[in-house]
Amino acid sequence: MDTHLKRGILDVCVLRAIQNEDSYGYKIIKDMKPYLEMSESTLYTILKRLELSKMLIVYSIEHNGRLRKYYRITKLGLNRIEEFKKEEAMTKCKKAS
């Protein structure tokens, strides 16, 4: 699979995982596990890329005496999910014709 394509799909998977509620790294991996196996290093690389692309924001909250990083999707991140859905629909239409 093309590296850029794979990266794009993984980015959207992570965005979808935090689409409905803010989350933190371990929970994202746990929530995605039934659908997709992902290492922590891969996830944190994706989260950093999405943060730099302004598709999510990061904030910290204290939990059991330690700071935990939470991730929240932005409007750009929501737009990326919608773009991906449209791209998928176009691909399915092309295959059907």
Placement of each model-derived feature along the sequence:
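Short, hydrophobic-biased segments on the C-terminal half of alpha helices
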Residues: 44-49
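N-terminal helix-turn-helix DNA-binding core of bacterial DNA-binding proteins
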Residues: 2-42
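Beta-hairpin "wing" of winged helix-turn-helix
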Residues: 53-67, 72
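Short alpha-helical
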Residues: 50-51, 79
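Amphipathic alpha-helical dimerization/coiled-coil segments
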Residues: 79-97
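Accessory beta->alpha helical hairpin/"wing" motif in late/C-terminal subdomains of nucleic-acid enzymes
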Residues: 73-78
